[in-house]
């Protein structure tokens, strides 16, 4: 049934729905001011939530945060200071020497792979580029891919594509028989099959060889797991079949792989010691960031005054570690957390609590970006808007100080777009309107909040800001679009059941079921297919010429990865679950025990 569904419907083009004041469903008073407020505005809230016995409001019954501010403040930050810095610098130099000494191309690639999976590659970007340049140029200078070594060929292909080099899928043709199928004897090479499987996820649209490689390797790796053979390799295979490396959150992957590597027969003790100490040092930087944003969140008063909304400061910060973990980007993580927290709160205003009349007023006030216009709002919306207004203006002020560039109009546009698209969904719900899947996705890739996050991301990590990038940013380039679609579809897979129970518009799964008569299981399979198809589009655009920096593009990819991670086992953001709690503990709270010998 699922296969018929996948082939019977055309692939959606995911064009952006136009926002026009002439569109009745998006009709909003268009009065804007690009005024800039450098100092925060204070708001005295008369009551905690404006209520009226005549207004029937929904409730999501969100539970309080399990991570309260006092607990975050009590965290003891270890692994800081001169001793740790001295130790890590010694280990870093030892590993740098390894990178310079290794000359065998396969050993070079394997060392890069280990460094990436241990979360250490960010220390050696120049060395890794030098090695990959050499591997790539030698290959084009007459050196051939080694047809007899599937593992080496696939590893080489994957690392080169990951780092932006152009490599043809045809390198895998030498592993096919005269009928054009992958050779049956390859099934005996499980290490090679796993390498082929991971490489296949870097495919773009139309690359049929890699499609075949994915299907072929998946089938035989699943058979290998069933036979329960060599334990360590089976663990790696199971892990990859759950999610390929290309789709995984890098920091969480590093934490998992450090444990695996510790028990590897070929473990390099220097690499292991470096990985464990570096993880703890980076975690200490994250804990310092977390304390700051927890203090900010408490100071907003949103938890007390908007009691219907999600109180998720740690989960919001967890998102940011998924986007950019390197210790030097602490400012980015702290600002990202504010953006995530504001999106979460405003989403609950539109989805859970606000009446349609109130939401139209709120959208109008955000469009104006004018504190004088907020008198028309109920009290709970006043504090919400003021927190948004002050926080975003402060971010813009930081950029003005740093780069002498006025960015408030770009940030404001991102929030206006978000609220407009929230309002569309609120009207759908109010009118009991059931959109088509196409119509839903055209709205929902904006309402997921990812474009708003990524617009802010550009300014947080870019210096200097360029006109070419800004012109592109205003139209939401494809790299933002594909990341946002994946985030939305992953969210829907994890949250749609709970959201429908509390009262919400149909999500992607229900839209597809309504259109086709498919079962929920069949619809879920189709949404997974759309995620996979969108990754192909993103793979193409990440390697294309772009006005954006590598770090920004990586953040866009990481947002998609983080969404798939957080919604893998249900609503890991709003409702929380055991998996999310365990991941937060391992990534942000509990350091890796070190061998003191």
From Swiss-Prot:
GO terms for biological process: diterpenoid biosynthetic process. Its cofactor is Mg(2+); Mn(2+). Mg(2+) 3 binds at residues 491, 495, 499. The keyword Disulfide bond does not apply. Binds 3 Mg(2+) or Mn(2+) ions per subunit. Residues 1-56 form a transit peptide. Its EC number is 4.2.3.15. The Asp-Asp-Xaa-Xaa-Asp/Glu (DDXXD/E) motif is important for the catalytic activity, presumably through binding to Mg(2+). Involved in monoterpene (C10) biosynthesis. The major product is myrcene followed by minor amounts (1.2%) of the cyclic monoterpene limonene. This is Myrcene synthase, chloroplastic.
